[in-house]
Amino acid sequence: MVNTLRVMLWDEEIGRLAWDDRRRLSYFTYNPEFLKKGIDVSPLQAPVRGIRAMTPVWGEDAKMYQKLPAFLADSLPDAWGNQLFELWRIQNHIPNADITPLDKLSFIGKRGMGALEFLPEVTKADKAEMIDVKSLADLAERIFIERENAHIMPEESITMQSLLTVGTSAGGRQPKAIIAINKTTGEVRSGQVAGLQDYDYYILKFGDTKYSSAEIEMTYYEMAIKSGIDMMPSRLYEIDGNRNFITKRFDRDGERKLHTQTLAAISPETDSYEGLVAVCRKLHLPETDCQEVFRRLVFNVLSNNTDDHTKNFSFVMDEAGLWRLSPAYDLTYIIDTGGYLPNTGHCMYVRSKLHHISYDDAILFAKDNGIRRADAIIREVADSLRQFRDIAKRYAVQDRWISSIESAINTHLVSWGLEDKDNSSSFEIDGKSCTDVRIEQAYKGNFHLYASIDGRACKFIIGKNKPEYATIQETGLSNLPETMLR
């Protein structure tokens, strides 16, 4: 059990983190020598100026911070990293009752996102060993499915050690690894060791073929770039025939680490896009960053990226202490628990709303927050989203997902008055009046054909075993001709 950690930034100790066993809470105290530099690593929560800098910074009670000060909790492993940590704990016969958040930070050591490091570290990445990415992907998939019940075979111990090294620090639920790829040969090594010549550092997100997850995220990446959103270069990366999504790290500038804080860390109380803009201004960011927040808001709503929680927005600080909004990341389509329909609830508020955010809400948001060219930005984003089908086809997204996502995007565009197309039709068959004829996807994946026939509401189920089902998927709900509805 670790009771005290040295917290390092760019080879300098910025302070000590200790564990109060009686209060079951951690506290951080600044190194007086570091305070003299005046570099604010947490300007809103733990400023280095004034009386607050001389008093302990106690941990947060909210679950996501695990009893740590918010600006240090960012370095903790997320859901996927915790799965790997649990396996490591079990393999090393460490009782769960003996584990504190400081143990987890010690386990992360120098491998965390951003530039903060924690000493002493339990596991070290002293050499940039070559990685068998095929074995890494196979083991990651098994652990993700079996969780703590996964049994690691003796012959897999080296792969497991590699996965612990490259996989525990990346955030999020999805299995990930931090890798470095040689620019010339394509050779893959651990991305946790600095100083590799002619290598680029990436986050590798293992794809899920059932959900076309890598292909969909790549499609969203391209649409975001076309929308004018700032993102790191990304691409698909094939491993044994399966495609995965890789993106360059924004917390690295060549061999140097950049200090990084998520919105959750830098301002724990913020839960809205209005609050995010306010944080940008408190950090004295340029107005282009505030405009970027608005552009992402519009993209997230219209593209149904509802996983817009406070850990999916970040800020980076250089060694001069200057802050900027980080490039966007984790932009993708979010489905509901049924596995087919779009999830409708956002994580961050827009004008006190998580659902049914409208064009008027966006325009008023821009007016209230001093964002210029709001309508032009909205239309730029809409133009990029109209290209979804063509881009998704190019990246071989499965037809069922193209149909579902295209329908969700079209619904949002129509509700914002950006698309005139109405997917319903009216006609007469054999003397019967058929009005408001339309097809919608149901919760468990079937399609429902709705119509009002001579004033009577009717519903017909098109199951997955029907020949029309595949045709609807291939054509897309937004593109069904009237002849097919007839």
Locate each region found by the language model:
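Phosphate/dinucleotide-binding and metal-coordinating scaffold of catalytic cores
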Residues: M1-T310, S314-N423
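Short linear proline/tyrosine/threonine-rich motifs used for host-factor recruitment
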Residues: F427, T435, H448-I453, A457-F460, ...
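Accessory DNA-engaging acidic/polar modules
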Residues: G15, C434, I439, G445-N446
